[in-house]
Amino acid sequence: VGNSIPTYRDIKEEYYKFYMTDQQGKMTEEKVEYFNEERKRFEEIYSMTPENSDLTAVEIVQKQEENKYAHEGFSEAYSQVMYIMSNNQGKGVNEQELVYEKGYQLLFGDKAVKERLIGILLCVIAAVYSASGVLGTEYDLKVMNLLRSTKRGRKELFLKKLGVSFGITAVIFVLVKIPAILKVVGEYPLECWGAKVRSMMFAGQSVINCSIFGYVLMLMIMQLVTLFVIVFSTMALSVVLKDSTMTMILSLLLFGGPLLIEWGGVPIVHYLSLNSLLDGHQILQGNWL
């Protein structure tokens, strides 16, 4: 029952969502005028006194309370309008757009940190499991004739096993990412894929001012390529250790351990490990440390 009662934050968010989704897109004079008129309306409400209005002090307080959530939501939207106008005027082009940010914050990895790290950890476990087994099994089963054949034969075997592990990792990556993306798409209106990524205040420091779609694509490519690096590194470790169990344990400690440490509340490890590439939003925002 408690979950069905909207909180202050929920109501404020709904008003912010209303203002942004109603006006999102390229900035126009009409949109600027609309927001200025709303700002004036709220200023009048919160500057009311019994002397300058036909309301009593009690009625004024009641009216201000009734508009509290709408005013808070509008203020958040208006600050975004000012941000966009300032950036566009500074560049002399109407490039940045009004965008309802919340859904994109989840897609970029700016929110729900622990949930995101769990998803990445599942992908890392899949990468390590597949990579430690494909060659490790050869050693465990003493299939040494395959590994001691010729240099060309060893290379072909390694590449074949590497391809298998890449494929398994890619499939798991898709199975983890697609439901997460669909969940966000189902909960938030994402209608500005072509807008510049710096249109959003939380992504205003992006080192590449590409489209939002391009930014999301870059994040996914960074994650997948990093997972492939983990696969390759794990297989190389397997060649050295010649034991699938030891390879899996050490690889999980090397690549999964930092994710668990960051999940546990030590954010600095993000910048000192592959976490920064597996979760590349901070790097793309120019945050190296």
Give the residues covered by each predicted segment.
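Extracellular/periplasmic helix-loop-helix junctions in multi-pass membrane proteins
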Residues: W263-L289
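Short helix-to-coil transition segments within interhelical loops
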Residues: R148-R154
